[in-house]
Amino acid sequence: MIEMLKTLPPTLREKKRYIAFKILYDEELKEGEVVNLIRKAVLEYYGSWGTSKANPWLVYYDFPYGILRCQRDNVDYVKASLILIREFKEKPVNIICLGVSGTIRKAKIKFLGIKKPKRWFVIRRERLKAKKQK
């Protein structure tokens, strides 16, 4: 019999924060380019150990705005590394941190100006099958 690992209670889980940012660049950047730009900046400033500890992850991107997830204890290091980005593809680039929030929804409302952000719900297969049969 296979035993499943127990999930950690909320008090022991790593706390996350969401950094809203704006990119100032001449051309539109693709999501992959932004991920590489952020990853490179955090690695240069914070090192591989610090990068794994901060765990930066691009959650939302719609040029020129984006939301980056990181660990609560390392928010300041990630913000500092974003500010230090100076050029990309031999052109000047600047990333402005708009603010930090505890949820993606509040970051979108407060810093990106999205009035009613879409919520993603998990739809059960049974409901989908029932709707298709009707």
Swiss-Prot record:
Protein name: Ribonuclease P protein component 2
Organism of this sequence: Methanocaldococcus jannaschii (strain ATCC 43067 / DSM 2661 / JAL-1 / JCM 10045 / NBRC 100440) (Methanococcus jannaschii)
Key words of the record: Cytoplasm, Endonuclease, Hydrolase, Nuclease, tRNA processing
Assembly and binders: Consists of a catalytic RNA component and at least 4-5 protein subunits. Forms a subcomplex with Rnp3 which stimulates the catalytic RNA.
Location within or outside the cell: Cytoplasm
UniProt superkingdom: Archaea
Higher taxonomy: Archaea, Methanobacteriati, Methanobacteriota, Methanomada group, Methanococci
GO CC terms: cytoplasm; ribonuclease P complex
Family of this protein: Belongs to the eukaryotic/archaeal RNase P protein component 2 family.
